[in-house]
């Protein structure tokens, strides 16, 4: 899938077909400190990985040249997401083109070329959660009649919202890391804030000193290369709100591996967020 959300199926056997595929795993770079006959792992990082394959273009098509042009147009809108589906589920992996050969048409009016993509991260699945407060209606409480003065106890419905337990089950092969997250707050509300906690400890936090009118929404993203905080109007126009970000917070939070809590304050009609749960190999 390219930046315009156009898709090419490299397994359809009609226009495009990949074979002799390699590079779907990971490659780790290990740094050791030597102590006599013992080596102690000091640092571990993931090397850049590349998908390499043979590409057959126009196998069952009478217009192989036009099919090749179709692929050129697709590749003209980077970056790309590889969509990889197995028995374990559907995963994405971000990538950029690194090689595409172009030779003469082979017998049978097909092209057989080399193609390669450099991956910019691990496989991932999207994880989404949201909460919309329920309107607190007068009279939806309970009457307890055993006291001297019967009292109508209203349930604080809104008070239970905005707290999410998160289980980030990313598999990073021992590498340190966390999952970037995109938060969306829909107005009306004032001075929204949120934090990630573990027990009583606040791990990360973010806050914005601004009013969000009805119909507007605040979108804050910590995705690498897409880090932003913007206010989006009902007509789709957006404006940066960096100046309204509370710099006393850690800002641009990410979801740690394992269990944690995502706690929101002063949100409006709806709060939602999505993050990437990573897999080194799938």
Show the residue positions of the predicted features.
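Beta-strand elements of well-folded, non-transmembrane domains
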Residues: 55-59, 101, 119-123, 187-189, ...
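Short amphipathic beta-strand/extended segments with alternating polar/hydrophobic composition
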Residues: 19-21, 29-30, 91-98, 203-210, ...
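Intrinsically disordered, low-complexity segments enriched in serine, threonine, and glycine
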Residues: 134-282
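Oligomerization/assembly interface segments of phage tail-like spikes and tubes
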Residues: 38-63, 109-122, 260
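Short beta-strand and beta-hairpin "edge-sheet" elements
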Residues: 18-19, 25-26, 81-128
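Short, acidic/charged, Gly/Pro-enriched secondary-structure junctions
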Residues: 7, 58-100, 261
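Polar/acidic, low-complexity leader/linker segments enriched in S/T/G and N/D
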Residues: 1-34
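"Short basic amphipathic alpha-helical interaction patches in structured regions
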Residues: 66-73, 110-113, 129-134
């Amino acid at each position: 899938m390219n930046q315009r959300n156009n898709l090419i199926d490299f397994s359809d056997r009609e226009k495009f077909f990949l074979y002799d595929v390699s590079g779907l795993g990971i490659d780790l770079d290990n740094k050791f400190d030597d102590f006599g006959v013992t080596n102690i792992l000091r640092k571990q990082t993931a090397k850049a990985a590349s998908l390499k394959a043979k590409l057959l273009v126009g196998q069952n098509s009478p217009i192989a040249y036009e099919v090749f042009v179709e692929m050129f147009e697709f590749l003209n809108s980077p970056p790309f997401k590889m969509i990889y589906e197995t028995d374990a589920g559907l995963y994405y992996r971000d990538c950029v083109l690194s090689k595409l050969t172009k030779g003469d048409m082979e017998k049978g009016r097909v092209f057989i070329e080399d193609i390669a993509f450099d991956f910019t991260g691990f496989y991932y699945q999207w994880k989404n959660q949201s909460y919309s407060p329920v309107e607190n209606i007068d009279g939806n409480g309970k009457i307890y009649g055993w006291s001297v003065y019967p009292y109508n106890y209203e349930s604080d419905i809104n008070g239970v919202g905005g707290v999410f337990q998160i289980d980030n089950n990313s598999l990073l092969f021992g590498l340190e890391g966390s999952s970037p997250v995109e938060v969306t707050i829909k107005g009306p509300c004032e001075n929204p804030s949120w934090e990630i906690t573990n027990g009583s400890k606040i791990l990360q936090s973010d806050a914005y000193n601004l009013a969000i009118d009805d119909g507007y929404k605040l979108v804050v993203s910590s995705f690498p290369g897409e880090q932003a905080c913007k206010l989006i109007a009902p007509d789709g126009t957006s404006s940066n709100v960096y100046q309204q970000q509370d710099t006393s917070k850690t800002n641009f939070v990410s979801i740690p591996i394992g269990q944690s809590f995502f706690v929101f304050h002063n949100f409006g009609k709806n709060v939602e967020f999505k993050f990437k749960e990573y897999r080194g190999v799938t």
